[in-house]
A protein has these predicted regions:
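Alpha-helical hydrophobic membrane-insertion segments
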Residues: 4-18, 102-105, 147, 151-159
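Short, charged juxtamembrane terminal tails flanking transmembrane helices
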Residues: 160-168
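Interfacial helix-loop-helix junctions of multi-pass membrane proteins
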Residues: 115-143
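"…centered on the first transmembrane helix and the immediately adjacent amphipathic helix/loop
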Residues: 2-87
Length: 168
Protein backbone atom coordinates (compact mmCIF):
# COMPACT_ATOMS: atom_id res chain seq x y z
CA UNK A 1 0.00 0.00 0.00
CA UNK A 2 1.39 3.39 -0.95
CA UNK A 3 2.10 6.07 1.62
CA UNK A 4 -0.63 8.30 0.18
CA UNK A 5 -3.18 5.51 0.55
CA UNK A 6 -2.03 4.77 4.11
CA UNK A 7 -2.35 8.46 4.94
CA UNK A 8 -5.86 8.51 3.44
CA UNK A 9 -6.89 5.50 5.52
CA UNK A 10 -5.37 7.15 8.59
CA UNK A 11 -7.39 10.32 7.96
CA UNK A 12 -10.62 8.33 7.51
CA UNK A 13 -9.98 6.40 10.73
CA UNK A 14 -9.18 9.64 12.56
CA UNK A 15 -12.35 11.31 11.26
CA UNK A 16 -14.51 8.29 12.14
CA UNK A 17 -12.94 8.09 15.61
CA UNK A 18 -13.53 11.81 16.20
CA UNK A 19 -17.17 11.50 15.09
CA UNK A 20 -17.68 8.48 17.33
CA UNK A 21 -16.09 10.31 20.27
CA UNK A 22 -18.47 13.24 19.78
CA UNK A 23 -21.38 10.81 19.44
CA UNK A 24 -20.44 8.94 22.63
CA UNK A 25 -19.97 12.22 24.52
CA UNK A 26 -23.39 13.45 23.38
CA UNK A 27 -24.99 10.11 24.25
CA UNK A 28 -23.54 10.13 27.76
CA UNK A 29 -24.33 13.82 28.23
CA UNK A 30 -27.99 13.27 27.24
CA UNK A 31 -28.24 10.08 29.23
CA UNK A 32 -26.94 11.64 32.42
CA UNK A 33 -28.97 14.85 32.39
CA UNK A 34 -31.33 15.58 35.26
CA UNK A 35 -34.68 13.78 35.16
CA UNK A 36 -36.80 16.93 34.98
CA UNK A 37 -34.76 18.31 32.06
CA UNK A 38 -35.02 15.01 30.23
CA UNK A 39 -38.80 14.87 30.75
CA UNK A 40 -39.26 18.47 29.57
CA UNK A 41 -37.22 17.81 26.44
CA UNK A 42 -39.13 14.64 25.59
CA UNK A 43 -42.46 16.33 26.29
CA UNK A 44 -41.58 19.23 23.98
CA UNK A 45 -40.69 16.80 21.19
CA UNK A 46 -43.90 14.81 21.76
CA UNK A 47 -45.95 18.01 21.58
CA UNK A 48 -44.26 19.09 18.34
CA UNK A 49 -44.81 15.68 16.75
CA UNK A 50 -48.42 15.66 17.92
CA UNK A 51 -49.07 19.10 16.44
CA UNK A 52 -47.39 18.19 13.15
CA UNK A 53 -48.99 14.78 12.73
CA UNK A 54 -52.51 15.44 13.99
CA UNK A 55 -54.86 18.37 13.56
CA UNK A 56 -56.29 17.97 17.06
CA UNK A 57 -54.63 18.04 20.44
CA UNK A 58 -53.45 14.66 21.74
CA UNK A 59 -55.13 13.09 24.76
CA UNK A 60 -53.18 11.74 27.74
CA UNK A 61 -53.03 8.15 26.42
CA UNK A 62 -51.72 9.27 23.03
CA UNK A 63 -49.11 11.49 24.68
CA UNK A 64 -47.99 8.63 26.94
CA UNK A 65 -47.77 6.18 24.02
CA UNK A 66 -45.82 8.62 21.85
CA UNK A 67 -43.51 9.47 24.75
CA UNK A 68 -42.82 5.76 25.37
CA UNK A 69 -42.23 5.15 21.66
CA UNK A 70 -39.77 8.06 21.38
CA UNK A 71 -37.80 7.00 24.44
CA UNK A 72 -37.70 3.38 23.27
CA UNK A 73 -36.55 4.33 19.78
CA UNK A 74 -33.95 6.73 21.19
CA UNK A 75 -32.27 3.90 23.11
CA UNK A 76 -32.47 1.51 20.20
CA UNK A 77 -31.45 3.83 17.38
CA UNK A 78 -28.62 5.61 19.22
CA UNK A 79 -26.89 2.36 20.10
CA UNK A 80 -27.45 0.95 16.61
CA UNK A 81 -25.66 3.98 15.15
CA UNK A 82 -22.92 3.70 17.77
CA UNK A 83 -22.31 0.04 17.03
CA UNK A 84 -22.38 0.53 13.24
CA UNK A 85 -19.88 3.37 13.48
CA UNK A 86 -17.53 1.48 15.76
CA UNK A 87 -17.68 -1.56 13.45
CA UNK A 88 -16.66 0.73 10.60
CA UNK A 89 -13.68 1.95 12.60
CA UNK A 90 -12.74 -1.65 13.51
CA UNK A 91 -12.74 -2.67 9.83
CA UNK A 92 -10.64 0.35 8.87
CA UNK A 93 -8.10 -0.24 11.65
CA UNK A 94 -7.71 -4.00 11.27
CA UNK A 95 -6.71 -5.24 7.81
CA UNK A 96 -6.60 -9.01 8.28
CA UNK A 97 -9.73 -11.17 8.89
CA UNK A 98 -8.51 -12.35 12.31
CA UNK A 99 -7.86 -8.75 13.32
CA UNK A 100 -11.26 -7.69 12.04
CA UNK A 101 -12.92 -10.43 14.07
CA UNK A 102 -11.00 -9.23 17.13
CA UNK A 103 -12.08 -5.66 16.32
CA UNK A 104 -15.75 -6.67 16.11
CA UNK A 105 -15.57 -8.58 19.40
CA UNK A 106 -13.84 -5.61 21.05
CA UNK A 107 -16.50 -3.33 19.54
CA UNK A 108 -19.28 -5.45 20.99
CA UNK A 109 -17.69 -5.42 24.44
CA UNK A 110 -17.18 -1.64 24.40
CA UNK A 111 -20.69 -0.96 23.10
CA UNK A 112 -22.29 -3.38 25.57
CA UNK A 113 -20.36 -1.75 28.43
CA UNK A 114 -21.58 1.68 27.28
CA UNK A 115 -25.12 0.33 26.86
CA UNK A 116 -25.24 -0.99 30.40
CA UNK A 117 -23.06 1.73 31.90
CA UNK A 118 -25.20 4.63 30.69
CA UNK A 119 -28.21 3.05 32.36
CA UNK A 120 -26.33 2.07 35.52
CA UNK A 121 -24.98 5.57 36.15
CA UNK A 122 -28.42 7.14 35.72
CA UNK A 123 -29.26 6.06 39.26
CA UNK A 124 -26.73 8.60 40.56
CA UNK A 125 -28.43 11.51 38.75
CA UNK A 126 -31.31 13.42 40.37
CA UNK A 127 -34.68 12.35 38.99
CA UNK A 128 -33.28 9.42 36.99
CA UNK A 129 -33.25 5.72 37.75
CA UNK A 130 -31.82 2.48 36.42
CA UNK A 131 -34.14 0.44 34.22
CA UNK A 132 -32.94 -2.95 33.03
CA UNK A 133 -35.42 -2.76 30.13
CA UNK A 134 -33.60 0.30 28.80
CA UNK A 135 -30.25 -1.43 29.17
CA UNK A 136 -31.59 -4.35 27.12
CA UNK A 137 -32.93 -1.95 24.48
CA UNK A 138 -29.46 -0.44 24.27
CA UNK A 139 -27.87 -3.87 23.89
CA UNK A 140 -30.43 -4.88 21.23
CA UNK A 141 -29.49 -1.69 19.39
CA UNK A 142 -25.82 -2.69 19.56
CA UNK A 143 -26.65 -6.11 18.08
CA UNK A 144 -28.76 -4.59 15.30
CA UNK A 145 -25.96 -2.13 14.51
CA UNK A 146 -23.47 -5.00 14.24
CA UNK A 147 -25.82 -7.07 12.06
CA UNK A 148 -26.54 -4.05 9.84
CA UNK A 149 -22.82 -3.46 9.42
CA UNK A 150 -22.16 -7.10 8.52
CA UNK A 151 -24.99 -7.08 5.96
CA UNK A 152 -23.70 -3.82 4.46
CA UNK A 153 -20.18 -5.28 4.33
CA UNK A 154 -21.45 -8.42 2.58
CA UNK A 155 -23.33 -6.33 0.03
CA UNK A 156 -20.26 -4.16 -0.55
CA UNK A 157 -18.07 -7.27 -0.90
CA UNK A 158 -20.51 -8.87 -3.38
CA UNK A 159 -20.69 -5.69 -5.49
CA UNK A 160 -16.92 -5.35 -5.51
CA UNK A 161 -16.45 -9.02 -6.42
CA UNK A 162 -19.01 -8.73 -9.20
CA UNK A 163 -17.48 -5.57 -10.65
CA UNK A 164 -13.97 -7.07 -10.58
CA UNK A 165 -15.17 -10.26 -12.34
CA UNK A 166 -16.93 -8.19 -15.04
CA UNK A 167 -13.81 -6.11 -15.68
CA UNK A 168 -11.73 -9.22 -16.42
Amino acid sequence: MSNAKKFGVFLVVLLCAACMFVFIYTLVKLSLQEGESSSRLTQAVVNQIGEAAFDEELDANQIHALNLFLRTMAHFVLFSILSFGMCTIAFLVFAHPAGRFFGLVLNMLICAALAYGTEYFKQFVDGRHFQIEDAWLNIYGVIIGLCSFLIADLIFWAIRARSSSQSE
